[in-house]
Amino acid sequence: YTDLGLLTCDPVVGQDMTRLFNQLSGYAPKSSFHRLLVAPRTVRSGLIQRIRREEDAARAGKEAWIKIKVNSIVDEKTIDALYRASQAGVKIDIVERGICALKPGVPGLSENIRVRSILGRFLEHSRIYAFANSDGPQIGEGPAAGPEVWIGSADLMHRNLDRRVEALVRITAPEQIDELIKYVDLQMADSTTSWHMAAD
């Protein structure tokens, strides 16, 4: 199957991971993180914050887009946030492998959302969350402006967001950010063999 990982010696990520494992072992109390979103506490809220930032940017006439690649989408709060962003004019591309409770292309609700599922012999298993972040505002220690991209283990499902420890890490290297955005764009391209989800 296919997946993504980050091999890094970045001390900020190393410190975050140390805090996370100390928290899991009971050695440390509830921790805060610099470059991680960790379920069940901050993945849903962190993603919805960034979706709302794109919604605000679109309403202000600025560049606004969201690109998501996951296994499944069933979380109602996240879906509602994506619907509101679509209604504001945010262009949303989603590549998903399995269950999708979101309905794309519904006039007045989700006409700016496209959903694709790759057809092929490899099991798609990577998760990517990318946001235009055209000029902020900065959320946490994220970039003040420019694309913000996260990879990790969390799908948009209740079990991932509420009942498991899952982590997303923010990518900071410009070349890696560009590569991940192009990866999603390639999977969304008309030339890629994929199943297209319609409003019905």
List each model region and its residues:
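PLD/PLD-like phosphodiesterase catalytic module centered on the HKD motif
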Residues: 10-14, 28, 40-199
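Polar, glycine-rich mid-to-C-terminal structural blocks
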Residues: 2, 6-37
